[in-house]
Amino acid sequence: MHAYRTHTCGELRKSHVGETVKISGWLHRRRDHGGVMFIDLRDHYGLTQIVFNPGSPGFATVERLRAESVITVEGKVVARDAELVNANLGTGEIEVVGGAVSVQSEAAELPMPVFGDHSYPEEIRLKHRYLDLRREQLHKNMVLRSQVIASLRRRMVAEGFTEYQTPILTASSPEGARDFLVPSRLHPGEFYALPQAPQQFKQLLMVSGFDRYFQIAPCFRDEDARADRSPGEFYQLDIEMSFVTQEDVFNSIEPVMRGVFEEFADWEGKGRKVAEGPFVHIPYAEAMLKYGVDKPDLRNPILCSDVSDIMMRDDVTLAVFKKIVGGGGIVRAIPAPNSGDQPRSFFDKMDAWAKKEMQAPGLGYMRFVEENGALTATGPIAKFFEPAALAALAEKAGVKAGDALFFSAGDKTAAVRLQGQARIRVGEELGIIEPGVFRFCWIVDFPMYEWDEDNKKVDFSHNPFSMPQGGMEALLAADTVEKQLDLKAFQYDIVCNGVELSSGAIRNHRPEVMLKAFELAGYGPEVVEAKFGGMLNAFRYGAPPHGGIAPGVDRIVMLLAETDSLRDVILFPMNQQARDLLMGAPSPVDERQLKELNIRLAPVVKPQP
């Protein structure tokens, strides 16, 4: 018989009754029932219940051991009585009558229990991540992650893609976030950078004559943590293709994304589905108008509208809205379907939320009702609208009697931000978010440039390597700031249930077009040559039209696992302060290492309170 196990803790079934077996695992839970000891033994594969009678050779051993001690048990498989069968457990039809017990490792007193669903502070969980990972749900999440990555690889190969590995040590480049820098011992005073993404390398692969590249790529960005972004590193399904249009990229990636989500839609019996039909295409401007965000959750049926023009009518006397629109601001309407009978507290709650969470002046509203066959409205601001104005407002906003309408007003940036978050909030409060479905969309026609208010200049809105729609002709014709801000890029995002999974683009593969695009953003040729010279020079020797995308693996798994935090799908994540509490990183290093790297530390200057 094997030294540790003949079967795993999730393997034994009724067909094994009568067999003598040996299983090993962690002592998950112990229960004393009138002198008879029951334990659950756990390993990677599941749980097995073991019963020890008072005369059993292992009784005294399991009685004294703490939870999470690692033991090997030899015993006989017996069937449970019908009324004791646990249908929620794979091994629930049997139990093992325990005999000899070998202790492989005794557990000290635990800083946090593994059994149960108790909530513990993140600091304790991350410091003792090896205990946290033993907990059932987190353990399942990590297995799901592995299965998702395997599925992605399999599907990419089936679509004709080939996996290649790109360098981890590379040059620093201004791609958005701060770089993690690595000092060079051989070249004092010079630094490598960990790649924020394999962006330039995957494009160079296309220039090198390869096609349909993919990689499960680690990416490193020195940025603050968010629920949907983990500090330090993350993984993405990095993709690039040659001789493709935007539609070609969509047609290649949709089957992969749909297939993965369909494969795991029923994970853990969740009974979800992927919405039928091709992924919806939504222009960026339309997304910002209808949803107030560029990553809309299409499970929410609420569609917003711009009602600024209605506020300037003569039969509308709401002075505050007129002043906002007259000063260049906007007013957006957010419908609240079938909420006209909601109590006043619902509307007060929304207004309080806007003031506290969004730092907005408030969230005006009105309720639409029918009186004597005519549509009218009630609420604090309804009195400022004549019947004809109310009818026009209802028609434009798409509301009817029994609905309510919230208003977001202010300068465009603030009003749209409040509109987007209010739409989400109203949908959640009314319980109208469609359950059990994954709804994808492509956001297209992103602006090439945006206005940098801090530096009072035009700059790239997203990826500087995107091909402008219209090419060089469009760039040459953009001779004013207004025209430059109207330029669109062949750039796109893929979104699922309000989560941006990836940005992508058709690349700017022509050196003269790239230099002109950077020129409009205020970067001279010397800057482009210094930062992107390797890629620019490669383009001078013949570059194919190419494009790609890079869906985030962590976010895909987060959606499938139905968790709100990326840390729940990453094995050993950092905390919010970008510290690895388990390994103690970052940490000081000794003087010898610094000397080898020709580094001298400056005194840390603490900010004044």
Curated annotation (Swiss-Prot):
Q: Which domain of life is it from?
A: Bacteria
Cross-referenced CDD domains, in alphabetical order?
AspRS_core, EcAspRS_like_N
Q: Reaction catalysed by this chain?
A: tRNA(Asx) + L-aspartate + ATP = L-aspartyl-tRNA(Asx) + AMP + diphosphate
Q: Tell me the compartments it is located in.
A: Cytoplasm
Where is L-aspartate annotated to bind? Answer: 175, 221, 462, 507
- Keyword Protease in the entry? The reply is no
Q: Where is this region: Aspartate?
A: 199-202
| Site (described: Important for tRNA non-discrimination) | 33
Residue numbers binding ATP:
221-223, 500, 552-555
Q: Name one GO biological process term.
A: aspartyl-tRNA aminoacylation
EC numbers listed for it are 6.1.1.23
Keywords, ordered alphabetically = Aminoacyl-tRNA synthetase, ATP-binding, Cytoplasm, Ligase, Nucleotide-binding, Protein biosynthesis
UniProt cross-references to InterPro entries, sorted A to Z: Aa-tRNA-synt_II, aa-tRNA-synth_II, aa-tRNA-synth_II/BPL/LPL, Asp-tRNA-ligase_1, Asp-tRNA-ligase_1_N, Asp/Asn-tRNA-synth_IIb, AspRS_core, GAD-like_sf
Kindly give the PROSITE patterns that the UniProt entry links to this protein: AA_TRNA_LIGASE_II (PS50862)
Q: Which GO terms describe its cellular component?
A: cytoplasm
Single GO term (MF): aspartate-tRNA ligase activity
Q: How does it assemble?
A: Homodimer.
Report the family membership.
Belongs to the class-II aminoacyl-tRNA synthetase family. Type 1 subfamily.
Q: Cite the HAMAP family for this sequence.
A: Asp_tRNA_synth_type1 (MF_00044)
The role this protein plays is: Aspartyl-tRNA synthetase with relaxed tRNA specificity since it is able to aspartylate not only its cognate tRNA(Asp) but also tRNA(Asn). Reaction proceeds in two steps: L-aspartate is first activated by ATP to form Asp-AMP and then transferred to the acceptor end of tRNA(Asp/Asn).
| Name the UniProt record assigns to this protein | Aspartate--tRNA(Asp/Asn) ligase
Could you tell me which species this protein originates from?
Hyphomonas neptunium (strain ATCC 15444)
Recorded name of the encoding gene: aspS
